[in-house]
Structure formats: C-alpha cells, structure tokens
Amino acid sequence: MKYFDLDGKKSYFNISKYVIGWRPALMVRVCDNVVDDGYFISVNLLDNAEKPIIPEDCIAFDVNNVGPEVYARLRQLGFFEEVDTVNSGFCFYPVCKLNLKKIKEYAV
C-alpha cells in the first residue's frame, strides 16, 4: 500500500460500499503516532424511492464536513475529477468520477 500527503500527514483510503444503493463509501485515514483518524469524504444521496442519484463510478463529495483544501488536494493528486453537481437540501455537492485504480493503490 502507498500513502499520500494530506496537510503534511501520511494518509490513505478505506473503501467500502453504502448498504443502500451500493455506491462507493470513501474514507480518508490520516496516520499519526497514536491512532489513525478517519473521516468520510463521500455522502450517499438517494431519491424519494431510496435509489442512488449518483452514478456507480462516482461519489458525492461531502462539502458539508470536509474542507475545500482536502477536496482540492485529492483532486490535484488525481484520485477523482468533478463531472457534475447535485443538489440535496440546501447543499450542492460535487459529483466526482473516481479513479478507482489509483485509489486502490492507496487503500487497505
């Protein structure tokens, strides 16, 4: 497994799937000397029938809880590209096509 630099800290991904819709659930893990802290960078957006509104090879980036500098850095590193935006409630989420081959190199 490889690591990438995020704000001066060694970081990697955890990849899983959301139970409803089976879309990628992407978590960034940040290494430190005690414990690896992590946070999800994706959100599972569903329509009224609980069907995913994001394409299978994409995520809705969680701009409510993840800073713009993280979004910019991960995009700069080529882990995804923004292909659209989607509205949910009061928020517009970037829809990002994942470079899963590259992400898996940096994932456990």
Identify the role of each PLM range:
Residues M1-V19:
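Short, charged/polar N-terminal "headpieces" of proteins
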Residues K9, Y18, C31-N33, L46-N48, ...:
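Generic structural motif
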Residues F13-F40:
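Catalytic phosphate/metal-binding cores of nucleic-acid and nucleotide-processing enzymes, i.e., regions
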Residues V30-G78:
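Acidic, aromatic-enriched beta-alpha/helix-loop junctions
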Residues V63-V108:
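Short, compact, well-ordered microdomains
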